Amino acid sequence: QCGHQDGKVTVPHADFLAKINAVRYAFLELGVDDGIIVARTDSLGAGLTKQIAITNEEGDLGDQYNSFLDVEEITPDNMNHGDVMISQNGKIVRPKRLPSNLYQFRKGTGEARCVLDSITSLQNGADLIWIETEKPHIGQIAEMMNEIRKTIPNAKLVYNNSPSFNWTLNFRQQVFDSMSNSGKDI
């Protein structure tokens, strides 16, 4: 789904990177020397994932992805039949699982997930990144790009120029907010 619509669900990086690799191999097989892969992430607005990522050691990509899950610490006394549990930071936790079998991310983790998605995609074959946002917000996208460029200095962004965004109104609001926050008399 579009990043500015409800109902987005992400997949673990391994699933997405398999698609990037498939495109890169298709370029090689077909002799496409100037093909460009644009990796899009809707993590900013996605509150759900279809599955828990596979992780083999603390700090690996799967562990980083799972660290964004909304979890509760549990003990053997409050484990239920059918519960899914993972080990995180030396504790046993239960990710919040919905009746749809989707798992919920913690609130407020969207920007950090976008940064991780983007860095991971660029390190694994993507040429450009596309971060889908709910509205055009230059400050928000700039903050994420600044974080990405700490790891990948030459990272390049493709940004959504969707007609469903009211660009003029949103930019005017951003200028107004900036002036108000800086104490200018408006």
What are these regions (language model features)?
Residues 1-186:
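Alpha/beta enzyme core
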